[in-house]
Amino acid sequence: MAELDQLPDESSSAKALVSLKEGSLSNTWNEKYSSLQKTPVWKGRNTSPAVEMPFRNSKRSRLFSDEDDRQINTRSPKRNQRVAMVPQKFTATMSTPDKKASQKIGFRLRNLLKLPKAHKWCIYEWFYSNIDKPLFEGDNDFCVCLKESFPNLKTRKLTRVEWGKIRRLMGKPRRCSSAFFEEERSALKQKRQKIRLLQQRKVADVSQFKDLPDEIPLPLVIGTKVTARLRGVHDGLFTGQIDAVDTLNATYRVTFDRTGLGTHTIPDYEVLSNEPHETMPIAAFGQKQRPSRFFMTPPRLHYTPPLQSPIMDNDPLLGQSPWRSKISGSDTETLGGFPVEFLIQVTRLSKILMIKKEHIKKLREMNTDAEKLKSYSMPISIEFQRRYATIVLELEQLNKDLNKVLHKVQQYCYELAPDQGLQPADQPTDMRRRCEEEAQEIVRHANSSTGQPCVENENLTDLISRLTAILLQIKCLAEGGDLNSFEFKSLTDSLNDIKSTIDASNISCFQNNVEIHVAHIQSGLSQMGNLHAFAANNTNRD
């Protein structure tokens, strides 16, 4: 009976059910009911504190939880304080990696790249030639297929279920099969060939090249610093310089910088320019088509070459060429869309530049040797001085020959200007003629502003008009922005005309006060780039 008296009454049980349904129990009920749920204390030999084991009922109701069997602690558990994560800005005071650790990582990376497979993986992953860059760095096949299949899909943030639905609609892709790889290689070769045709302006209809990117890279030129893939004994990437371009076989002749590699012929899809390369929109190739040379080209000035050309006899390259019978034809014959005589001059120009480059290299080495001898207070031998003087004299002769060839090439370029989309101009150029007319009007107006002429000498008035015309030409060149070799050389021709009309005693004054300043302005306008060779004073007075 005493045990029955200790059990809770019915009202207490009902109150407990109501409080349990509401989600909380009263503290009084917990204190009263917890005394009945205590279990015996198991004491062991090595257990100092008492461990309380909860009593487990055999049957449980789905309306009750384990909280009824567990002693409820009135004290709230200790909570860990939340630390607000505030993004910190990177400062210079942050700890940097240890130098030894960095060296260790760099050493391991270097050893990794020495492995042939790792080296090839880096090449395949990051090395793209100029002709392949727009093909591989654009949209992949999945993006292109997505645009064609779902043109109204403007977003790319879809759920996994939506992407799965799109993949089921598009079908299962065919990958990693021999037929797939062969098809991809064939498509890549076709795109490369189309880009080459665009670069060489051999396209009649641009609508057939819609599968190409919007920007087409321009072909590399001679003298460009490149990184090329070399195969064979020295397999890898090496830096060098382009010495020749073979458009027929789509290759470049590259001279490598590393000693012992020499010069090799590299395909264009394994040559990458070290500098940012220019591109041209594909639509521009359709707008600037070269017109037919037989119908749309204006009449040319024909040069009458001698019966036996000294170039053919003295040049071993052209003399032994199988094209000799074709090259020795008349000036009206063309080869590759250009006059044969023009191609001969370009070939000779290239050879002269190559020889001049070798002489400059020798001269640079001799200057270094002379500086070493001077620093050691050692005398310079007569043989050394003789060799140095010989190179200087040969360079002088090369410059004269180079100027003659450049003059002929410039004449042909002037004739070929209409074929390249440029407006034909008469010599002297239109800009020079306009500037001279405007200068004469300005000088005439300023001279007669007071009612009577201030300068009565006609020679002085003409000299002032010509000097004013030079200032107007410089102004037009600076404001125009589109500087070409014809307009640039017209400025030099104006200076030469003025120098030929003044007295010999005033030439030194003209050079010190006018010509040298105009030369500085020319250098600033053109940056002495590709126009410098064509802007050189003509020493060919034949």
Swiss-Prot record:
Paired cysteines (S-S): none
Gene Ontology cellular component terms for the protein in this record: nucleoplasm; transcription repressor complex
Ranges in a coiled coil: 355-413
GO molecular function, one term: DNA binding
Alphabetical GO biological process terms: DNA biosynthetic process; DNA-templated transcription; regulation of cell cycle; regulation of transcription by RNA polymerase II
Phosphoserine modified-residue sites: S65, S95, S309, S321
Region ranges (Sufficient for interaction with RB1): 2-296
Pfam families per record: DIRP, LIN9_C
N-acetylalanine PTM sites in chain numbering: A2
Covalent crosslink: Glycyl lysine isopeptide (Lys-Gly) (interchain with G-Cter in SUMO2): K21
InterPro entries with a match to the protein in the record: DIRP, LIN-9/ALY1, LIN9_C
PANTHER family linked to this entry: LIN-9, PROTEIN LIN-9 HOMOLOG
Family: Belongs to the lin-9 family.
Record's subunit section: Component of the DREAM complex (also named LINC complex) at least composed of E2F4, E2F5, LIN9, LIN37, LIN52, LIN54, MYBL1, MYBL2, RBL1, RBL2, RBBP4, TFDP1 and TFDP2. The complex exists in quiescent cells where it represses cell cycle-dependent genes. It dissociates in S phase when LIN9, LIN37, LIN52 and LIN54 form a subcomplex that binds to MYBL2. Interacts with RB1.
Task of the protein: Acts as a tumor suppressor. Inhibits DNA synthesis. Its ability to inhibit oncogenic transformation is mediated through its association with RB1. Plays a role in the expression of genes required for the G1/S transition.
Name of protein: Protein lin-9 homolog
Protein species of origin: Macaca fascicularis
Encoding gene, per UniProt annotation: LIN9
